[in-house]
């Protein structure tokens, strides 16, 4: 049966009150949803996002998928059906058979179907128990208002080009903007429990493919491979590394993931361990923000740090729990109990340049609330030339497309000879296999360390007179310049990416184990930062120096072991551009 014709003028009248007068409407069209009778949709593409206004039996309801939650779109054609199944667009599908689509240039397309299908990919926020998570949503628009496929495809391509321009913030054109730069992705297969390959395959590559972002993927082959790689390659050939001119991105595959957790916290992006959807979207979008970097100096090395410098209790846990790496982040909890039982003390001198006024810092952020898209559960189908649907054989074609599970990628990740990146990666993306001829041999690197010069005296020279000195026995000293230093370690609640502040925590000997336990429990919520006792002190500083006595102990920089002995650090604001989630 044919569905009744819709009066477009009356539809405009009903729905006009739902559209924000400040939003600019770029495109709009009327669609029918095939799985539901008497349901008409007015779909608008605005400066805010994709608006779906549903009109059913006189009632009206509007929902919007925000532009910041849309990663990309693609035009498709229906696939040629198997012999005997019938190729007429009006023929019935058997059971709940789903529409099969192929690329518009495929040789396996159905030439009898004049429809053009636009798939719009989004990852929207959904409540999940006590937190939020992103859920993949696909909106399918079927264009068949014209008698020829070429005309329908032209209309679909216009929507696709407009979506792409809005996503990247460029003026609207008739053709999608071309991404002529690639991402450089360095993957550490040994990070954390060793599941980086699987996480990239399942969580990152699909988002980059849907966003049509080309990339080069290099799997690290030995310790410091990434450092050697960027020292000896021209990194300006890539649009980002996953440096003030070449932005840096982080995708958490390890155990700590402090920087990734910090980004999600500061930019209202839900963080779910081993679910990198939000940060993958950020990588595809390429929005950036400046980040401070800390210059760290030891007796034999100069390095640049983005997360922490540690001495004592937490550093002991970080390094000594490596033997439990296979269990992931839980290793920190297990080893914390062990170190609490066998509590150690370290004698030395801690000196620092205190920042006196931090009153202008923002208050700690509140937990994330749901303020993103709410998508329409259903796929949409445009009317034909007479604005009628005269058969219902496709009633189940898109029934599951909005909230259906993404098909598991089964491409061969481990192919010895493959240089393609697999996982339906965008055309031109490359995977550089760990089985290359150079994988077993580490070539010498002849490059120097570049970075800002120090403003401090040399490591063994006297410090300025205004510095504060703390001498005695310490349980731990830990400095951080990020909000989180681990998935559940809210170390510095007031910290920002580019505030020029190092938060220096000192816990002196004499504190009881119960007080340390209470302190550790408070770290998960950040309440420890308000404690100021004779044994616990947290100070905002611009630089510090630690001079431990003896030779037995552990010092770490960003969770990595460094030589034990004098160490000093100073912060340099806005040194790195970091890829961050989109807040627009």
Residue ranges: model-predicted function:
Residues 38, 48-51, 57-58, 72, ...:
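Conserved beta-strand elements of beta-rich interaction domains across eukaryotes
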Residues 28-30, 35-39, 57-59, 102-107, ...:
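Eukaryotic intrinsically disordered and solvent-exposed regulatory patches
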Residues 220-222, 228, 235-239, 245-482:
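Catalytic core of DAGKc-family lipid kinases
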Residues 51-53, 59-61, 80-82, 127-130, ...:
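Eukaryotic short linear interaction motifs
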Residues 286, 336-352, 441-444, 453-455, ...:
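Catalytic phosphate-donor-binding core of small-molecule kinases
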Residues 2-243:
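ATP/NTP phosphate-donor binding region
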Residues 148, 153, 157-161, 541-542, ...:
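Generic C-terminus detector
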Residues 43, 50, 70, 159, ...:
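Structural signal for hydrophobic/aromatic residues that build the beta-strand cores
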């Amino acid at each position: 049966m044919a569905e009744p014709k819709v009066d477009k003028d009356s539809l405009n009248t009903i729905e006009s009150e739902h559209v924000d007068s400040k939003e600019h409407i770029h495109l709009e069209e009327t669609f029918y949803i095939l799985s539901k009778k008497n349901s008409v949709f007015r779909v608008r593409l605005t400066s805010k996002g994709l608006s779906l206004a549903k009109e059913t039996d006189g009632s009206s309801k509007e929902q919007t998928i925000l532009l910041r939650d849309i990663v990309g779109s693609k035009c498709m054609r229906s696939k040629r059906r198997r012999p005997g199944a019938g190729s007429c667009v009006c023929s019935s599908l058997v059971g709940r058979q789903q529409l099969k689509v192929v690329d518009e240039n495929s040789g396996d397309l159905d030439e009898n179907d004049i429809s053009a299908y636009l798939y719009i990919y989004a990852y929207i926020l959904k409540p999940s128990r006590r937190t939020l998570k992103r859920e993949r949503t696909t909106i399918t628009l079927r264009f068949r208002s014209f008698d020829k496929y070429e005309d329908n495809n032209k209309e679909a391509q216009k929507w696709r080009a407009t979506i792409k321009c809005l996503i990247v913030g460029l003026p609207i054109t008739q053709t999608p903007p071309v991404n002529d730069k690639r991402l450089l992705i360095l993957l550490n297969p040994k990070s954390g429990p060793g599941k980086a390959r699987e996480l990239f395959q399942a969580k990152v590559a699909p988002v980059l493919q849907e966003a049509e972002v080309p990339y080069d993927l290099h799997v690290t082959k030995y310790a410091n491979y990434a450092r050697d790689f960027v020292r000896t390659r021209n990194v300006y050939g890539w649009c980002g590394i996953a440096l003030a001119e070449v932005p840096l991105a982080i995708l958490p595959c390890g155990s700590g993931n402090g920087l990734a957790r910090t980004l999600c916290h500061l930019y209202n992006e839900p963080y779910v361990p081993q679910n990198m959807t939000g940060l993958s979207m950020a990588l595809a979008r390429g929005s950036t923000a400046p980040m401070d970097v800390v210059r760290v100096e030891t007796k034999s090395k100069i390095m640049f740090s983005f997360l922490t410098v540690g001495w004592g209790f937490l550093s002991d846990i970080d390094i000594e729990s490596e033997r439990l790496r296979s269990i992931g982040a839980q290793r920190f909890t297990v080893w914390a109990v062990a170190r609490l039982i066998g509590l150690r003390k370290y004698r030395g001198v801690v000196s620092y340049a205190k920042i006196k006024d931090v009153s202008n810092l923002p208050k700690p952020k509140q937990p994330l609330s749901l303020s993103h898209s709410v998508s329409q559960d259903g796929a949409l189908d445009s009317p034909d030339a007479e604005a009628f649907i005269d058969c219902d054989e496709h009633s189940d074609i898109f029934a599951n497309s909005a909230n259906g599970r993404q098909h598991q990628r089964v491409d061969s990740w481990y192919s010895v000879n493959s240089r393609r990146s697999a996982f339906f990666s965008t055309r031109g993306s490359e995977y550089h296999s760990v089985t290359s001829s150079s994988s077993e041999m580490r070539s010498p690197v002849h490059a120097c360390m570049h970075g800002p010069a120090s403003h401090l005296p040399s490591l063994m020279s006297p410090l300025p007179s205004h510095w504060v000195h703390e001498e005695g026995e310490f349980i731990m000293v830990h400095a951080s310049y990020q909000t989180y230093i681990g998935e559940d370690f809210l170390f510095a609640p007031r910290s920002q990416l580019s505030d020029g502040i190092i938060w220096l925590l000192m816990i002196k000997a004499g504190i009881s184990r119960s007080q340390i336990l209470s302190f550790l429990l408070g770290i998960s919520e950040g309440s420890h930062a308000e404690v100021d006792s004779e044994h616990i002190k947290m100070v905002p500083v611009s630089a510090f120096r630690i001079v431990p006595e003896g030779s037995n102990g552990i010092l770490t920089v960003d969770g990595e072991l460094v030589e034990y002995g004098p160490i000093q650090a100073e912060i340099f604001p806005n040194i790195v551009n970091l890829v961050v989630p989109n807040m627009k």
